[in-house]
From Swiss-Prot:
Protein name per the record: Probable cytosol aminopeptidase
Organism: Microcystis aeruginosa (strain NIES-843 / IAM M-2473)
One term under GO cellular component: cytoplasm
UniProt family annotation: Belongs to the peptidase M17 family.
Active site: K270, R345
Name of encoding gene: pepA
NCBIfam families per UniProt: PRK00913.1-2, PRK00913.2-3
Amino acid sequence: MDIRSTDTSLLTWTGDTLALGLPEGAIEIAGELAELNDKLGGNLGDLISETEFEGKLGSSAATRLGGGPIRKLILVGLGKTADFDLQTLRLAAAAIARLAKQQKSQALAISLPVVGDQSATAGAITEGLLLATHQDTRFKSTKEEKGAKLETVELLGLGEQASAIAKSEQICSGVILARELVNAPANTVTPLTMAETAEQIAAEYGLSLNILEQEECESLGMGAFLGVAKASDIPPKFLHLIYKPQGTPKRKLAIVGKSLTFDSGGLNIKGAGSGIETMKMDMGGGAATLGAAKAIAQLQPEVEVHFICPATENMISGRAMHPGDILTASNGKTIEVNNTDAEGRLTLADGLVFAEKLEVDAIVDLATLTGACVIALGDDIAGLWSSDESLAAQIQEAAKLAGEKFWPMPLEEKYFEGMKSQIADMKNTGPRPGGSITAALFLKQFINNTPWLHLDIAGPVWSDKENGVNNSGATGFPVRTLVNWVMANN
């Protein structure tokens, strides 16, 4: 899809399909809309009245106009003017893209209000278009593409914004990579595949890559990570991908993503009704980490970023860790495994220790960590825990810019009492109440002084149905937040 911005107004544009975004309220055909209505032979007014279109958020209407200067007309509602933000533009662009597909449009022009500035507006619209039109059909034997495809999109009245559009295309390439990694089944994406993906990113964009094999992980004392990996016939891969700017970096950051390419639960096996068939998505944190790496490598900020993915499976075999085993993490702390299905935090423990040894300025980890977080916050909102208020504020600002939702959660130290072990330093799970909080408190034991933030993304990494800029399946959450955070440190 070729997306470009232009000074052309909606009154002078001619072509296949014109899409307008209109705010909520009684829509008056006056001024520019009156001129457009005249140009379209009264069809704009007819469409508004016949469909009772009032501009409510999520509403839309479309019609074919015949053989005039514009052949199809699309209207989308933007909601209340006071609530306009960049996410309004993304959602409007996504709705327009889907309607244009239904109308079999090949050339599309979009007229939406400016939010912030023209550059930010063009970028947000581009994101909405690209993310809504992405369809992962790799595993279909018969492709469902029929008829015309959307080939060109003009963003009207925004002037030349090629740089902003290119930036959004680069960010979306990372989101799409994350989506496709999560969408793929566990017999396609394994720890080896994760390593190959990291190699491709490193080769294409000039990043450094260090893949720690099992023996190297053993030499570093990564007993928690390797305890999870023991049962799988596929060897673990501890991935360390590094982006460095050409000059002196302004900051050094680390992103650590949980990378369980399949989670059977281990000997505490996931039973009927547990959603075991969806556990290909348990590497959503690692997928987003690699997606962010791909985007950041293209954007080239003056920030050094370390992307860390402890990749393995959690399987069942004669070698599997047992409930009751004691593991020693790479910082020397001992863990009594009272549930083998709380394995993600074990892999992250060694990932966090590794990250802190790099002497970075801040560490963010992200993981599909707990069902408890989904119960608390639902499918659309991720949980956020942090030891540092400034870092938490940075991530929340980055998320707001991306239109991705997080909710700050407490690190209630009292709850860690339930994770204390009589024979080790800690257990890997606590009592059922506050399960997402105790999981975050567990991770906190593997950070000393570096500002640290944990994201539990178990809900938003997947959507069972079309939702905003996402189609059903993997969402690529929260690649755009991570990228915005890194760029804000630039």
